Amino acid sequence: IFIIYSPDNAKAPTKVGGKKIMGMDTKDMMNEMGAAFAVTWLVFGYTAYTMDGDVVTGTELMGIGMSGIMAVAALGVAWMAFAGAHILPPVTWMHIMTGDLGDTDAWATNGAKLAMQVVGGALALIMMAEMYDGPSYADAWPNGQEDWAFDAMTMAGGIAAGAILWCIHSKTDNAWATAIGVIAMGTYVGAEGSTDMASMLMNDMDDLMPVLLDWVMTGVSVGLGALLATKIDENL
């Protein structure tokens, strides 16, 4: 069962029978973390060093990757298996921006979901690091991440992608349709944002501000797109 909340009932809690912490069911938090773990491991994957070249040419992705029919299938199955989990940051941000922005419980619930996505991604990265030998974060980014800078076209792309993805997500009520939308617009919606955050936090947080700002601002732009789509739909 793939649960999609409409803007009118976006703050309705998922009844899974666990204890409440910060307005969010503990089982729901574990569900979100487990889903993020599975998707990070099986879909986002891990870049391993093959010893056939330098750190750029001699690497191999150990995972499905965010492209193709297998990625769509994996995400679709994940949303059905982990019913109620958002799994990806853009989905959570769309629910935030189309819900009641004055509802503190909703903010706590969605904030906890974002945190659990990072925790789940971090656990998957730890496991994969033990399973495979590969380049370190320092090898991949020897000079660190570039400072984040506002770009109007990037923001506009995120808003447009968010509007389209929310229409797909809220109107089709179908995990496969949402998965197709995410894969088609993965770069614009920041689908791998939680894993990027997890990787940065596990590597001394040297690039905290660039990665954090990109994670937040991409999410906000996607959420604004979802809000825009909702307002347009309400006034047609």
Which residues are covered by each model-predicted region?
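Membrane-interface helix-loop junctions and terminal tails of multi-pass membrane proteins
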Residues: 1-236
